[in-house]
């Protein structure tokens, strides 16, 4: 879904009118938060956020997986597979599955680490452990009560923050903020900005670490676009962040096309993008997540060959602190189990 503009405006009349509905939704969500889920038998690290929409969870999961591997762990991801038709549990195979089967984010992650898609997250534990998981990375699911979380890392965009801080549908929050804060073990703030400073202060007051991170563009992706004028398009939680990132790298973005998160690109979309690019001699560029959806759609796979990917990774300002936090947290879980 595309984020409504009023989610960022506390003064919006429509947002205020929806507050009673949000209160009901929030009461149900808060009750779900208090439930205890299945114990996995191995440490479960949840990477989530307080609100609907994108904040950088997938790059965070990939970065954590790399760190965990360097610590000698075997991480396996469990994802709901948003946007996919398969309920699972099923191991994602990039050579066999399409985004329509398992979702674009699991498909992208499965190119570098084992990913289990399971609509019921607890059902994904057995296949994850069968793959040798010593640690489970739960992609999203902070508000889902079916699988017990041992360590919860919340990701927030430093510039966008939490919008108007009202509960869905009056705002982007998935549940009331206080019970979410109380269940947060660490906060990851992606990018510059002060929109989450008060949240950071609250987490620090509870003794949790606040980890700053930044999106780092792949040098080869940037080099391939130098000297070219591009038409950038994206169907992610915050397309504007993608466009800003391109410009920050010196890429000449002549045109932008923003789509809703997880947008299923159609032949009509592809034709319009091709026409616009050809008209002005522009190179098409998109995110790795969007390209995963394009490549695995047999009707438009040929179009994907002409699109340049813009790959990014997440780098933590203090990776040593993160490594210590993960090692201590995992060791504590194992002592208790």
UniProtKB/Swiss-Prot annotation:
GO CC terms in record: plasma membrane
Pathway given in the UniProt record: Glycolipid biosynthesis; lipid IV(A) biosynthesis; lipid IV(A) from (3R)-3-hydroxytetradecanoyl-[acyl-carrier-protein] and UDP-N-acetyl-alpha-D-glucosamine: step 6/6
Enzyme class, spelled out: transferase
Pfam family name, one: LpxK
InterPro entries the record matches: LpxK, P-loop_NTPase
Keyword line: ATP-binding, Kinase, Lipid A biosynthesis, Lipid biosynthesis, Lipid metabolism, Nucleotide-binding, Transferase
GO terms classed as biological process: lipid A biosynthetic process; lipopolysaccharide core region biosynthetic process
Any one GO molecular-function label of the UniProt entry: tetraacyldisaccharide 4'-kinase activity
Binding of ATP, residues: 51-58
Record carries keyword Membrane: no
Record's catalysed reaction(s): a lipid A disaccharide + ATP = a lipid IVA + ADP + H(+)
The protein's Enzyme Commission number: 2.7.1.130
Record family assignment: Belongs to the LpxK family.
Function as written in the Swiss-Prot or TrEMBL entry: Transfers the gamma-phosphate of ATP to the 4'-position of a tetraacyldisaccharide 1-phosphate intermediate (termed DS-1-P) to form tetraacyldisaccharide 1,4'-bis-phosphate (lipid IVA).
PANTHER family the UniProt entry points to: TETRAACYLDISACCHARIDE 4'-KINASE, TETRAACYLDISACCHARIDE 4'-KINASE, MITOCHONDRIAL-RELATED
Protein known as: Tetraacyldisaccharide 4'-kinase
Originating species: Nitrobacter winogradskyi (strain ATCC 25391 / DSM 10237 / CIP 104748 / NCIMB 11846 / Nb-255)
Lineage of the species this protein comes from: Bacteria, Pseudomonadati, Pseudomonadota, Alphaproteobacteria, Hyphomicrobiales
Gene: lpxK
């Amino acid at each position: 879904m595309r984020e409504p503009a009023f989610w960022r405006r506390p003064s919006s009349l429509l947002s205020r009118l929806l507050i009673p509905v949000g209160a009901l939704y929030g009461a149900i969500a808060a009750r779900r938060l208090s439930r205890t889920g299945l114990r996995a038998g191995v440490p479960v690290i949840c990477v989530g956020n307080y609100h609907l929409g994108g904040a950088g969870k997938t790059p965070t999961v990939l970065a954590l997986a790399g760190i965990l591997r360097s610590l000698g762990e075997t991480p396996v991801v469990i994802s709901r597979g948003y946007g996919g038709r398969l309920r699972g549990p099923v191991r994602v195979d990039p050579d066999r599955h399409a985004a329509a089967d398992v979702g674009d984010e699991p498909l992208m992650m499965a190119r570098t680490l084992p990913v289990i898609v399971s609509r019921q997250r607890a059902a994904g534990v057995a296949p994850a452990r069968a793959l040798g998981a010593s640690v489970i990375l739960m992609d999203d699911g902070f508000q889902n009560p079916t699988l017990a979380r041992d360590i919860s890392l919340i990701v927030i965009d430093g510039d966008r923050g939490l919008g108007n801080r009202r509960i869905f549908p009056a705002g982007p929050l998935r549940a009331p903020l206080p019970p979410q804060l109380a269940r947060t073990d660490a906060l990851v703030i992606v990018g510059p900005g002060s929109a989450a400073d008060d949240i950071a202060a609250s987490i620090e007051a509870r003794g949790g670490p606040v980890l700053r991170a930044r999106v780092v563009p792949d040098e080869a992706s940037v080099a391939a676009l130098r000297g070219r004028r591009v038409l950038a398009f994206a169907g992610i939680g915050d397309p504007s962040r993608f466009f800003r990132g391109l410009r920050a790298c010196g890429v000449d973005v002549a045109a932008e096309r923003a789509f809703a998160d997880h947008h299923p690109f159609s032949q009509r979309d592809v034709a319009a993008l091709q026409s616009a690019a050809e008209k002005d001699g522009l190179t098409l560029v998109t995110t790795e997540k969007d390209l995963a959806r394009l490549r695995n759609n047999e009707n438009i796979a040929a179009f994907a060959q002409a699109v340049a990917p813009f790959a990014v990774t997440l780098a933590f300002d203090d990776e040593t602190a993160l490594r210590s936090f993960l090692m201590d947290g995992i060791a504590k879980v194992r002592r208790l189990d």
